[in-house]
Amino acid sequence: MLTIRKLNKKEDFESKLTKQQFIDFLYEHLGKFGDTKEAIEKSIDYACSDEKGKGGFLLAAYYKENLVGELIINNTGMSDYIPEHFLVYVAVDSKYRGKGFGGELVKKSIEICEGNVALHVEYDNPAKRLYERLGFYTKYAEM
């Protein structure tokens, strides 16, 4: 059974999962679709911010006490014309892919969010099919 833990402030990190371990996990498991560790850290800091217009949350997924997946949502501080939430990163350990853990993380994030959720995905990213199955669709071409 998958256990999903929500973090939304810096104090939520603990010895079992430090901020640096969260960053390292995403950096490793995002692979060629990822960003620098510095960019990942900025997204975490934004999600954990109390500043007006910022915020969000992180999810950490555990299977048999092993960290198997992570996700970051950043709030946009906008609504009506831009979705209120942006799914910045989601990654599953390659040893645990194909078990539905990525889908469970994304579904949980949608449940938690109040308002619309958007994301960017590269055309050749295999996760694109998962997002489409979960109801995401291409509305705009970004240029």
Give the predicted meaning of each segment:
Residues 17-20, 105-115:
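Alpha-helix C-terminal capping segments
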Residues 58-60, 66-75, 86, 91:
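Conserved beta-strand in the GNAT
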Residues 81-94, 120-122:
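Conserved acetyl-CoA binding element of GNAT-fold acetyltransferases
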Residues 103, 118, 123-142:
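Conserved active-site alpha-helix within GNAT-family acetyltransferase domains
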Residues 28-35, 46:
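N-terminal first-folded block
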Residues 46-60:
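A short helix-loop-beta-strand connector motif used in the catalytic cores of GNAT acetyltransferases and
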